[in-house]
């Protein structure tokens, strides 16, 4: 099985909260696509709560688009990581990590402004596969933790996993 890019970085050296360029590529027509690792928690030290990450999934994507979309950037998708330590964000364009970090910080401030569960978008059985598995208080606690900690940048050059460790497990 091919080794995915996300498994070639040393998770023991990752900082959080932090932004990392996970992948860059071009479409056949030449459009730049960038995938960002938005790491909320230090891997293997903490995870986002199930209900909190699910509620953030519903809120975060819209708020990030509000702060990041422009003439040169368009968010395609923001999805939670299976390990529940963050989100992957795919977009058209090549914004700098600090621009993404600033948008993320503003999106977390937006989460804190949501006042009631009913304000969570697509929170119904028709648009959500587990619409009862949400917690606005948990999402707000995550947002406050990110704001309080600040958002750094993880550089791939500092996280390259030694080849001798690639197949261990």
Swiss-Prot record:
Record-linked InterPro entries: LuxS_sf (IPR037005), Metalloenz_LuxS/M16 (IPR011249), S-ribosylhomocysteinase (IPR003815)
EC number: 4.4.1.21
Binding, Fe cation: 54, 58, 128
Main enzyme class: lyase
Note on how the cofactor is bound: Binds 1 Fe cation per subunit.
Signal peptide residues on this chain, from the entry's feature table: none
Keyword flag Zinc: no
Reaction it catalyzes: S-(5-deoxy-D-ribos-5-yl)-L-homocysteine = (S)-4,5-dihydroxypentane-2,3-dione + L-homocysteine
Pfam family for this entry, one: LuxS
Alphabetized UniProt keyword annotations: Autoinducer synthesis, Iron, Lyase, Metal-binding, Quorum sensing
Needed cofactors: Fe cation
GO molecular function, one term: iron ion binding
Record field: transmembrane: none
GO BP terms: quorum sensing
Lyase among keywords: yes
Functional description taken from the UniProt entry: Involved in the synthesis of autoinducer 2 (AI-2) which is secreted by bacteria and is used to communicate both the cell density and the metabolic potential of the environment. The regulation of gene expression in response to changes in cell density is called quorum sensing. Catalyzes the transformation of S-ribosylhomocysteine (RHC) to homocysteine (HC) and 4,5-dihydroxy-2,3-pentadione (DPD).
Record family assignment: Belongs to the LuxS family.
PANTHER family for this protein: S-RIBOSYLHOMOCYSTEINE LYASE
Subunit relationships: Homodimer.
Name of the protein: S-ribosylhomocysteine lyase
Organism encoding this protein: Shewanella denitrificans (strain OS217 / ATCC BAA-1090 / DSM 15013)
């Amino acid at each position: 099985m091919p080794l995915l890019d996300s498994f070639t970085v040393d998770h023991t050296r990752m900082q959080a909260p932090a932004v990392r360029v996970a992948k860059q590529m071009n479409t056949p027509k030449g459009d730049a696509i960038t995938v960002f690792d938005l790491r909320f928690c230090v891997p293997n030290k903490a995870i986002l709560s199930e209900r909190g990450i699910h509620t953030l999934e519903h809120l975060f994507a819209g708020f990030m688009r509000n702060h990041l979309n422009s003439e040169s950037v368009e968010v395609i998708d923001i999805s939670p990581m299976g390990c529940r330590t963050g989100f992957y964000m795919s977009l058209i364009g090549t914004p700098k990590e600090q621009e993404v970090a600033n948008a993320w910080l503003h999106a977390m401030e937006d989460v804190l402004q949501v006042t009631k569960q009913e304000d969570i978008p697509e929170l119904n059985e028709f648009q959500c596969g587990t619409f009862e598995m949400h917690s606005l208080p948990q999402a707000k606690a995550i947002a406050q933790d990110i704001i309080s900690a600040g958002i750094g940048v993880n550089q791939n050059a500092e996280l390259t996993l030694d080849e001798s460790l690639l197949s261990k497990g």
